[in-house]
């Protein structure tokens, strides 16, 4: 895209449109990293058989099939805190994305967790690190819904637009490593007046829950693989509020369910789903202890 030679008017307009969208994101990232103990370890990190530092996790189904978990991570951040090494993965989203622990019941919102657990597995370059969390960073246009008479600064509007969401380790000190003052400007969590983690302002898991979540996610992947190998690939999307599962599907005209006459109905509301997921993690902890 260098220079203006041979560019059409449309190409130039698209280029300037992209640049105008990127600049606010870069300014926000600059502000965040200026005050954070975390820094980028790698961008576009490949988890493939050809990468000796980060080979894929290999899982075995009960009937002998092998499943390899490959992919690419937008960004991996690292923080060295004394003898401890923390790692978090960040995914850039041009659209709206809100992580829900309850979605894991249905195999959703697992991709970034799979990546996190993969790069921390035995035999990788980060096997000596601990998981700090998974974060989704909105990377679209700055919100322009400010009401008449409002006095928000451009910086505040930018921070509101690009505040990350996701799941973090339940650790107040770790939160201050991500965000020095713990105000919840950049990450989905904040400290209360006593300097303790405000668990109502985000999704947090203990180290034990994070370990059991890894076990749950990998078990779900094996179960999915077994169902696919056995031919269970029905066009039966999950019914979710404000989401059309067929919106970007290239096969909606041949699946036989393009009108969504058949859908999976989720268990209760989002709060009930999250509660159910936490109960599953508790059950896995009891199994491990017994």
Region spans (language model):
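Structural signature of nuclease core domains in nucleic-acid processing machines
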Residues: 1-290
């Amino acid at each position: 895209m260098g220079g203006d030679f041979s560019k059409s008017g449309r190409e130039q307009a698209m280029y300037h449109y992209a640049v105008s969208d990127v600049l606010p994101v870069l300014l926000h990232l600059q502000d965040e990293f200026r005050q954070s103990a975390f820094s980028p370890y790698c961008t576009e990190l490949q988890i493939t058989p050809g990468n000796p530092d980060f080979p894929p996790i290999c899982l075995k189904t009960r009937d002998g099939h092998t499943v390899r978990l490959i992919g690419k991570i937008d960004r991996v951040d690292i923080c060295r805190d004394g003898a401890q090494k923390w790692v978090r993965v960040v995914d850039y989203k041009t659209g709206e994305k809100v992580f829900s622990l309850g979605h894991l019941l249905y195999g959703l919102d697992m991709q970034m967790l799979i990546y996190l657990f993969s790069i921390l597995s035995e035999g990788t370059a980060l096997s000596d690190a601990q998981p700090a969390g998974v974060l989704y960073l909105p990377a679209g246009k700055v919100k322009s819904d400010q009401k008449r008479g409002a006095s928000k600064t451009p910086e505040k509007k930018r921070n509101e637009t690009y505040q990350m969401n996701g799941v973090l380790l339940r650790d107040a000190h770790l939160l201050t490593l991500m965000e020095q003052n713990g105000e919840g400007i950049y990450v989905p969590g904040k400290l209360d007046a006593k300097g303790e983690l405000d668990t109502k302002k985000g999704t947090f898991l203990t180290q034990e829950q994070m370990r059991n979540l890894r076990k749950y996610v990998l078990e779900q992947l094996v179960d999915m693989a077994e169902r696919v190998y056995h031919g269970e690939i029905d066009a039966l999307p999950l019914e979710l509020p404000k989401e059309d599962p067929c919106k970007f599907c290239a096969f909606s005209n041949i699946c036989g369910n393009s009108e969504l006459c058949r859908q999976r109905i989720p268990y209760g509301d989002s709060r009930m789903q999250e509660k159910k997921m936490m109960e599953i993690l508790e059950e896995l902890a009891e199994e491990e202890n017994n």
